[in-house]
Amino acid sequence: MSTEKLQNDDKVVDEKYVDADEHSLVRSQDESFPQTEEGGEPTDHEMKTLRRVARKIPMSCWLVAIVELSERFTYYGLSTPFQNYMQGTRDSTPKGVLGLNQSGATALSYFWQFWCYVTPIFGAWIADTYLGKYFTICIFCIVMMVGIFILFITSLPSIASETTSLAGFIVAVIVIGIGTGGIKSNVSPLIADQIPKERPSIKVLKSGERVIEDPSITVSNVFMFFYLMINIGALSVIATTELEHHVDFWAAFLLPLCFFCVGILALVLGKNKYVKVPVGEKVIARSFKCAFIALSKLNFDAARPSHHPDREFPWDDAFVDEVQRALYACKVFAFYPIYWLVYGQMNNNFVSQAGQMELHGLPNDILQAINSITLIIFIPICERIVYPFIRRYTPFRAVTKIFWGFMFGAAAMVYAGVLQHFIYKAGPCYYFPMACDPQYKNVPNHIHIALQTPCYWLIGMSEIFASITGLEYAYTKAPVTMKSFIMSIFLLMNAFGSALGIALSPVSEDPKMVWTFNGLGVSCFIAGWIFWFTYKHYNYREDEWNNLEYRHEDLYHPTETRDPELEPVVSLTRSFKQYA
């Protein structure tokens, strides 16, 4: 790669990639260009002109997906009743336990989200440095199970009081957050690790059309499938909110506790079927050292051994390229806190908003299921119809998808703001729903709950473009032995979004909610456009960056093989392997 100054790196666009996009519509069968045989590596001309398709998803991906489904079933099944559990009291409507009111409950809800997305850093460090993804997931599953049990016990009516339940809730949130963080940073890289890292190849369809089987599209499809399984698991909110509404909170917490055992079972039974990438020796420390040298000199060539033969670096030039690519990805992630702040409204202020409306017998937190249903319906539509249709005419690359995710998120907030305006205009309590007079204490404003449905649909569509693509981007741009760590950096942006939510929680109260929602919508809209103009040229370097992955084809195989020099000397690891 030619010498590039760091400050100009993200502005340099290789002309051949621009050329590839400009000619993406061409489907020429010009005889003057040689045609590669089926199974062969496509020529530059074929890379520019042939349609790209995905390979089949390996069976081991299904096993990892079951693990994630059960973990997300548990996570969403627990967290959806949290807002009511924290906000209300036993005699309020909707009923609760801790009595923290909307502002306090929203702040604690954001802390819960913040904690769950900070802890992936720790889980990723353990995985990439010592245990590997599989055994890290196993250990943190046990941690998460302990936290759920604490939550269940302290919610039992025979034990529960505001003091006991609050103490138990805080301890449970901390322990569950550690567990889910350790799982979350590793399970998505693990499912993508199951895909063979093979170069693009020519395939002839039954119709006679010659296409390119593109691994990057396979990875994209796997993450869409992964996200689909997440949202099938997230349908647990229907069951847990009904249990909360008709039985009690302890029943809503018991169901996820039991279902989580399914994921642990899939994890154990699939032990010998997973592809397990070897752990790198101090790879995170080496990456930070490499990045520090490059940043201190404002030039990545300063860290390349080929440019400094008199110095001994514990890496090669290709490793520097991977670190550089990972830093590009981290720059893209910098805009995500605004998006996650918007997304977080679904878990707190949307629930509180629904509680101000006429529910007609429904729990106010059950509408979150619409978000999951949206994703379950539209992920296959995008994967099978929308994306292939767009790719027939033009590349539909990561930065473009993320931009549209921001736009859908902004639309969701604006709609919520308009809806809140009409809630305030409806009686009987207008700007202070259920709080204007003792006789209207439990009487909502006269507006139907169904009008909130588009909020969840728009958030769901934004996730397809922003959240799924972010997972894919974090995986494909990370060095091979740092997949979990870079994924945790992406997840950390959610924690920053939650921190912003904590800062804004004092204004999450009536009668300020119209301004809150609309302000978030405008912020997300502006952030999306700034993101687009800042990073749209990254689209043209996708193939170049993805090609760096293929030098590690030998690391992706169905059994775990460790280089003796890379074997971590950790007795916990060996003991766990013996009994897992």
Swiss-Prot record:
Bilayer-crossing regions: 57-78, 107-127, 134-154, 163-183, 219-239, 249-269, 326-346, 370-390, 402-422, 449-469, 484-504, 513-533
Residues of the signal peptide: none
Record's subcellular location: Cell membrane
One example of a Gene Ontology biological process annotation: oligopeptide transport
Any one Gene Ontology molecular-function term assigned to this protein's record: transmembrane transporter activity
Top-level taxon in the UniProt lineage: Eukaryota
Family affiliation: Belongs to the major facilitator superfamily. Proton-dependent oligopeptide transporter (POT/PTR) (TC 2.A.17) family.
Official protein name in the record: Peptide transporter PTR_B
Source organism of the structure: Candidozyma auris (Yeast)
